[in-house]
Each structure stands twice: as C-alpha cells, then as structure tokens.
Amino acid sequence: MTIVYLSLGTNMGDRAAYLQKALEALADLPQTRLLAQSSIYETTAWGKTSQADFLNMAYQLDTQLTAADFLKETQAIEQSLGRVRHEKWGSRTIDIDILLFGEEVYDTKELKVPHPYMTERAFVLIPLLELQPDLKLPPNHKLLRDYLAALDQSDITLFSAQ
C-alpha cells in the first residue's frame, strides 16, 4: 500500500456538498482506504484572484493503485461532479490534487508529484500539516512546516457551515 495525500478545493455552488460528494467517491475507489481528513478551510482564490472564495481540505489515503491509475480515478471523480477545465486556476466545482504519492516522484505531462505548487500555497499546507505535522517533501525531505512558516496565512480561516 502507498500513502497518498490529496488536496481538495471548490468555489462553485454548494461548496461543502461538493467536498462531501468527492469524499464519498474517493471512499469508493478500488484497492483504496481512507485514513484521515483535515478540517475544512475557507480561503481567497490563488492565481486568478477575481473569483469566489474556496473551501479547501486535505485527505490521507492508502492505495494499491498505481499513481497513473489513481490520477485517472480522481479525474473521473472531478468530471462526474461537473468539473470543466476552462482556464488555469479558474473556478471549479471540485479540484482533487495529488500532493504526495508515497515517496515517489513523478514529472510527466499528466502527473507531477510532489505537486509543484504545494509549497507555495498555505491553503494546501495548513490542512495537510493538520493530518501529519512532521510530513517531509520527497526527495529532499525538508519539513513542509518550514515552507508554511514563510507563507502568508492571513486569508485562511476555519470553515463552519451556518
């Protein structure tokens, strides 16, 4: 089994419902077991900032799927929940990013792991470190909390459904 860390985000429609539906679909993946989920955080948009706020969270799983097969499964979940890729960093019903896939490193057109922007995004690192505070980034094994210490965290708040 390979330990996998995911980041989930949404800024369209009923955001909390999209996260819940994505989690339910992830729970149904073959040869995969859900281990832990973070709290949900509300954040301003990153990259293209003129859009609605996001809800973000992290998930820890273990799987026997290959990284390529796991990516196909997560993309199928995104598509089933109405994800349309119009523009980079645009609004989305759901975004499921593979942050870490065990100690493996991938740099292909389809899959880049560790996720290339994760160390620049507090909205990724805060929920991820909630799951595993001593998590290290392969292959250099630098603590992820050291990256977080250098980032602005002022626009990230714990989400509470009203």
Curated annotation (Swiss-Prot):
GO terms for molecular function: 2-amino-4-hydroxy-6-hydroxymethyldihydropteridine diphosphokinase activity; ATP binding; kinase activity. Keywords: ATP-binding, Folate biosynthesis, Kinase, Nucleotide-binding, Transferase. Pathway: Cofactor biosynthesis; tetrahydrofolate biosynthesis; 2-amino-4-hydroxy-6-hydroxymethyl-7,8-dihydropteridine diphosphate from 7,8-dihydroneopterin triphosphate: step 4/4. Its EC number is 2.7.6.3. It comes from the Bacteria. One of its GO terms (biological process) is tetrahydrofolate biosynthetic process. It catalyses: 6-hydroxymethyl-7,8-dihydropterin + ATP = (7,8-dihydropterin-6-yl)methyl diphosphate + AMP + H(+). Pfam families: HPPK. PANTHER family: 2-AMINO-4-HYDROXY-6-HYDROXYMETHYLDIHYDROPTERIDINE PYROPHOSPHOKINASE. Catalyzes the transfer of pyrophosphate from adenosine triphosphate (ATP) to 6-hydroxymethyl-7,8-dihydropterin, an enzymatic step in folate biosynthesis pathway. Belongs to the HPPK family. This is 2-amino-4-hydroxy-6-hydroxymethyldihydropteridine pyrophosphokinase. It comes from Streptococcus pyogenes serotype M3 (strain ATCC BAA-595 / MGAS315). The gene is folK.
